[in-house]
Amino acid sequence: MTDRYVYDLSEGSAEMKPLLGGKGAGVAEMKRLGVPVPDGFTVTTEACVDTMTRKGEWPEDLESEVWDGLKRLEERTGRVLGDDKKPLLVSVRSGAVISMPGMMDTILNLGISDDTVEAIAKEAGNERFAWDCYRRFIQMYGEVVEGIDAHIYEDALTALKEKKGVESDTDLSADDLKGLVDTFKKLSNEQLGGNWTTDPREQLMRAVDAVFRSWLNPRAFVYRKANKIPDDLGTAVNVMQMVFGNRGDTSATGVCFTRNPATGEKELYGEFLVNAQGEDVVAGIRTPRSLAEMEEVLPEAYHDLIDTMKKMESHYRDMQDMEFTVENGKLYLLQTRNGKRTAAAALKVARDLVDEGVITKEEALMRIEPAQLDQLLHEAIDPDHSEQPVAEGLPASPGAAVGEAVFDADVAAERGAKGEKVVLIRFETTPDDIHGVIVSQGVLTAHGGMTSHAAVVARGMGKPCVAGARGIKIDAKAATLTIGDTVIHEGDMITLDGSTGEVFASGLKLIPPQINADFQEVLSWACLLYTSPSPRDQRGSRMPSSA
């Protein structure tokens, strides 16, 4: 136990991960290394655990410590939460000790209100940006903190875009967004009986509490059970000054990996969106652009990012998964963590890091979980088939998936639990679909990219995934997938090739797996390192049981 619950960013380090969570410790370590990160503070995992122990009641000193942390942040930034001249806006994000991508909650743009929106617009010289932040905040806060159904906001947004004749949120004007904010406020008050709070300090307290509660939500339980993560670790809460990827054409947000998490190759891998905020990428709301294109759009930030990727992989001696924002051309890092990867990628990365002299063979073996190796023993599509793909998307997670099409995560979970082979098809997956993803043979989405939550979770579980498939139309109510003249109904057979991104409207034949050179090489290390000629050594010789 520590004697306090709140730590400023400058007080943390990578070694404090059990206390500050992965995100808080990772950002603190980046700051220590001179990487540009937003300022902030972290509420510890112990605060969450103590709150759960007290059945949701905060420990006695926690609220005052949060206020003290906020005051110090305000002094460092020269901004004040709720101020109508120089307002402070913050993000409130979860941060588990063991990475759980997308399973817990985030609130962005907290601090924006009727009292501050004009000051934000004036300072930025961009009225549209300010009202975009405001509508995003109301929706995110309403869903996460107040429990308002997401479709209430989404339906209003969709109706506005249809009325204006536009397809993308970015096509809406400042006046359009101002009207949307009024609509969102009205809808929120209707749902809450007029009890929507506008006090940013109260909103901050409730947001921190909502992140604590998200540790206990059903999808988090399902993910922890599937990945054998203890339920008593709790989550930290990171309160950080907002940096904005939605300030215009010189701003962006994205996710990158220092190596390919699907194959393990040492190559550029990532995605970004111009004029967007982070949740747009990881939630799969918009299909992002390849990171390689960023060099043309934001060259200075791109080269800074490449340098930072190299620096962080060298520091952690492992493949990193990083989130970043570019605000008016300046790069900020929001997160770094050891990246989720497929079994094939785990072997490739481990072997290459040994060859590069970064880690030893013993370290490499300890990083490969025995359960992962089972993924390499799955069947593959017979290359001699004559079928033509009906659609192609992004090869988000490799492998072959053959099963009956289903369009609802609950249906997938029910049928999968009976041992039936199903492929989950969604417009975009959300973290709430995790129970359906776990039992499916594979996942197909119409939207989202290779760094969306769907892709990251699928790779970590060894599930084939094709994301952002072009030209497909999904009708969830009718349970149909339409691609040109081809219509796939629920129960029809479908095949996904997560290695190529191809989709086939039939069940293709599968063949036994082929053991690759990386697998053979790593097994040879195990034989050499864990088989000793000494009788005494032989008695204790064994492969490591876990990473």
Task: Provide a role label for each language-model segment.
Residues 542-546:
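Hydrophobic alpha-helical segments, chiefly the membrane-spanning helices
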Residues 336, 351, 355-356, 463, ...:
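Phosphate/diphosphate-binding loops
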Residues 1-385, 420-423, 430-435, 441, ...:
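Nucleotide/phosphate-binding sheet-loop regions of phosphoryl- and nucleotidyl-transfer enzymes
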Residues 530-537:
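Conserved small/polar residues in nucleotide/adenosyl-binding loops
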Residues 258, 413-415, 434, 484-487:
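Short, surface-exposed secondary-structure edge patches
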Residues 358-440, 502-510, 516-529:
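Protease-associated
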Residues 37-39, 443-445, 464-468:
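Short hydrophobic alpha-helical runs that function as membrane-insertion/retention elements
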